[in-house]
């Protein structure tokens, strides 16, 4: 047991080998390119992006939604067992919070290039308009990031103290201290679960409350966003866990991996099958009163993004995880998880396109795009929203994502993410409870 404890208190990545240093070099290069692209965008303005008046939310917001969901789902899955006094999936808790922290930092940073004038972001604090969902979302993102930092430190600080790390902030390792930490973990989970639900619900309501965007208005928007967070968050946690098990000293329990794969299948069924039907079927019935017309309207997607989400990112991983003989294989769990995250990405892309493709003034000349006017064509006006991300947007986005990847790499290198052995279950008063 002592050897197990000593091993658990070490980082799962003792040093960066050739592969690790190469990966760090790639991430650092992408970060530098991203910073350069952002500087170029700041100098020339948002005209360097593909966004215009008729399509004012682009790649930054699409991926903001994705990474908010990845973070919320990761923290929900890491904190829910502690809330219910369960030791199940304990081996994934620390890694899950680390991934959640990296994702929420990426999500928060993606706001900066989207607003065009990041030097004015302080006005969220100095002169907030509480009628705007954006103010609430900004506040929750900040609170959520701080909660992730606190929770990750709380989960690891005793092991950090046991090996004399300065990251423990001079906290000592003792039996009484660990008992107190168990109590704090419970109450942190009490705060983390509603915070995670609020984070992604408010993000969904930002879309639903936009004036003049009827395609986004739905009472199901918050449940859909929470389901999306559970699918993408668990999918990313499984991907990172399997990769960490393969390339570091982190050990992912095979039984719990299989169980989490089954749970991912349940989340996929609820999200892609039930909630999709609950949202689309009433609309189909309202427009078509024949059985085949209703069925075809429900099944036929609006765009290719619909099929990338529901087919490749929904039906395929669901079938893989619903087959008992397949979901026991780590490679199958990994593939299904990648596809689930991939599908969630295209669901977000489809969501933004759904709201912006149709404009409220569809008669000529339409809406001023806000772009350049050559004087020979009608490119200054548009009656339909179109969008293609520019190289500047892609470079900035990849640079921001590289920051999240670097945070996860740093956590693997410097934090004790492996649990040695199950502790006794804990009560809210800090005492032990036998299971």
Curated annotation (Swiss-Prot):
It comes from the Archaea. Signal peptide: none annotated. Keywords: Cell membrane, Membrane, Transmembrane, Transmembrane helix. Disulfide bonds: none annotated. GO terms for cellular component: plasma membrane. The keyword Transmembrane applies. Induction: By anaerobic conditions. Its expression is under the control of DmsR. Dimethyl sulfoxide (DMSO) reductase catalyzes the reduction of dimethyl sulfoxide (DMSO) to dimethyl sulfide (DMS) during anaerobic respiration; it can also use trimethylamine N-oxide (TMAO) as terminal electron acceptor. Subunit C is proposed to be a membrane anchoring subunit. This is Putative dimethyl sulfoxide reductase membrane subunit C. The gene is dmsC.
């Amino acid at each position: 047991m002592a050897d197990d404890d000593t091993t658990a208190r070490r980082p799962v990545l003792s040093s960066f080998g050739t592969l690790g240093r190469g990966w760090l070099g790639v991430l650092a290069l992408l970060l530098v390119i991203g910073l350069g692209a952002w500087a170029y965008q700041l100098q020339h303005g948002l005209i360097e992006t593909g966004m215009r008046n008729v399509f004012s939310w682009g790649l930054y917001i699409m991926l903001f939604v994705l990474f908010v969901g990845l973070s919320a789902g990761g923290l929900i899955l890491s904190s829910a067992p502690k809330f219910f006094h369960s030791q199940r999936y304990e081996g994934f808790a620390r890694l899950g919070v680390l991934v959640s922290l990296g994702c929420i930092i990426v999500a928060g940073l993606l706001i900066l290039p989207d607003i065009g004038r990041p030097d004015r972001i302080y006005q969220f604090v100095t002169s907030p308009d509480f009628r705007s969902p954006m103010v609430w979302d900004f506040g929750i993102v900040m609170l959520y990031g701080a909660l992730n930092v606190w929770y990750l430190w709380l989960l690891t600080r005793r092991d950090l103290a046991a090996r004399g790390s300065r990251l423990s902030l001079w906290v000592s390792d003792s039996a009484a201290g660990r008992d107190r930490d168990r109590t704090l973990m419970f109450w942190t989970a009490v705060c983390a679960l509603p915070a995670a639900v609020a984070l992604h619900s408010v993000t969904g309501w930002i879309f639903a409350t936009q004036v003049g965007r009827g395609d986004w208005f739905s009472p199901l928007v918050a449940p859909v966003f929470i389901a999306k967070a559970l699918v993408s968050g668990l999918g990313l946690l499984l991907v990172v866990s399997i990769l960490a098990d393969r390339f570091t000293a982190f050990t992912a329990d095979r039984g719990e991996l299989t169980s989490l794969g089954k749970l991912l299948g349940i989340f996929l069924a609820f999200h892609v099958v039930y909630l999709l039907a609950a949202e689309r079927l009433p609309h189909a019935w309202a427009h078509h009163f024949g059985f085949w017309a209703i069925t075809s309207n429900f099944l036929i997607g609006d765009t290719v993004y619909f099929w990338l989400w529901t087919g490749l990112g929904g039906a395929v991983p669901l079938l893989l995880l619903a087959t008992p003989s397949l979901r026991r294989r780590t490679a199958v769990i990994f593939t299904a998880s990648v596809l689930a995250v991939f599908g969630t990405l295209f669901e977000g892309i489809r969501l933004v396109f759904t709201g912006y493709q149709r404009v409220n003034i569809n008669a000529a000349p339409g809406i001023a795009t806000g772009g350049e006017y050559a004087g020979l064509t009608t490119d200054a006006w548009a009656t339909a929203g179109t969008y293609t991300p520019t190289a500047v947007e892609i470079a900035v986005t990849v640079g921001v994502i590289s920051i999240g990847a670097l945070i996860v790499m740093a956590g693997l290198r410097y934090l004790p993410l492996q649990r040695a052995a199950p502790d006794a279950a804990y009560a809210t008063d800090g005492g032990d409870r036998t299971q």
